[in-house]
Amino acid sequence: MGTDTVMSGRVRKDLSKTNPNGNIPENRSNSRKKIQRRSKKTLICPVQKLFDTCKKVFADGKSGTVPSQENIEMLRAVLDEIKPEDVGVNPKMSYFRSTVTGRSPLVTYLHIYACHRFSICIFCLPPSGVIPLHNHPEMTVFSKLLFGTMHIKSYDWVPDSPQPSSDTRLAKVKVDSDFTAPCDTSILYPADGGNMHCFTAKTACAVLDVIGPPYSDPAGRHCTYYFDYPFSSFSVDGVVVAEEEKEGYAWLKEREEKPEDLTVTALMYSGPTIKE
């Protein structure tokens, strides 16, 4: 046994008289470093925080079930804090570039996560890109504009209104405005908040969408696209709107097929990963 070992044994023995565990206390510098390492380990990246919050908010996962107001505000607060870099997107990426092809600009879909209770994704639109008017049956949807300027037009159905045909219904305009990031997260509900909406990119835009529950044909949550016509386009008995209010209403007619001017490509999400 060497001298260093003997001395070390004596030091430990002496310290054990005052330290019941017989352990040599760590110096403060090492303790601080360990605390700092622990703090770093507990930091949760924004997209992971979003995922964890969605699991709580959409725990029910049933069609038409609107989360409590407390849960809605909790998820809204998380989304309001998310920045483009938190999900790995920026305006310089190739799918935000303008192209001259004579066709509608390509919309890029980035899949982050999906289950039967909720989905998280990003829509990337170059300038003039359009997501045509469509619905969200029995869903609650949170949309966060990450960057850019976008025009949003949305409608809600007018309940119990006579219809000119089985595929055409009267709707009231909910939103018809430009939005520029940073701005508040928008929320639509199964029967309110602008359940049918259309996005038109004024500049390159990225929209982070959280949908609960997501589209599902077997569950009856099918995505339907619409044409919108001015109120004066149809004359229906029993439907009367004051002249000055007519611009606030429109007739929405179901489109039989997916819009020809909508081209969406799905690409791999390359931002921070989620741990389930």
Swiss-Prot record:
Keyword set includes ATP-binding: no
A GO biological process held by the record: peptidyl-cysteine oxidation
InterPro entries hit by this protein: PCO/ADO, RmlC-like_jellyroll, RmlC_Cupin_sf
A GO CC annotation given for this chain: nucleus
E.C. number(s) listed in UniProt: 1.13.11.20
Induction annotation: Up-regulated by hypoxia. Up-regulated by the ERF-VII transcription factor RAP2-12 during hypoxia.
Region described as Disordered: spans on this chain: 1-40
Reaction catalysed by this enzyme: L-cysteine + O2 = 3-sulfino-L-alanine + H(+)
Pfam families, alphabetized: PCO_ADO (PF07847)
Bias (Polar residues): 17-28
Compositional bias annotation for Basic residues: 30-40
pH dependence remark: Optimum pH is 8.5 with CGGAIISDFIPPPR peptide as substrate.
GO terms assigned for molecular function: cysteine dioxygenase activity; iron ion binding
Binding, Fe cation: 134, 136, 197
Cysteine disulfide partners in this protein: none
Keyword list, A-Z: Cytoplasm, Iron, Metal-binding, Nucleus, Oxidoreductase
Comment on bound cofactor: Binds 1 Fe(2+) cation per subunit.
Cofactor: Fe(2+)
Domain of life: Eukaryota
Record-linked PANTHER family: 2-AMINOETHANETHIOL DIOXYGENASE, PLANT CYSTEINE OXIDASE 2
Function, as annotated: Catalyzes the oxidation of N-terminal cysteine residues (N-Cys), thus preparing the protein for N-end rule pathway-mediated proteasomal degradation, upstream of the N-end rule enzymes ATE1, ATE2 and PRT6. Controls the preparation of the group VII ethylene response factor (ERF-VII) proteins for degradation via the 26S proteasome N-end rule pathway. Acts as an oxygen sensor that controls the stability of ERF-VII proteins, which are stabilized in flooding-induced hypoxia, and regulate transcriptional adaptation to these adverse conditions.
Family, similarity comment: Belongs to the cysteine dioxygenase family.
Official protein name in the record: Plant cysteine oxidase 2
Gene: PCO2
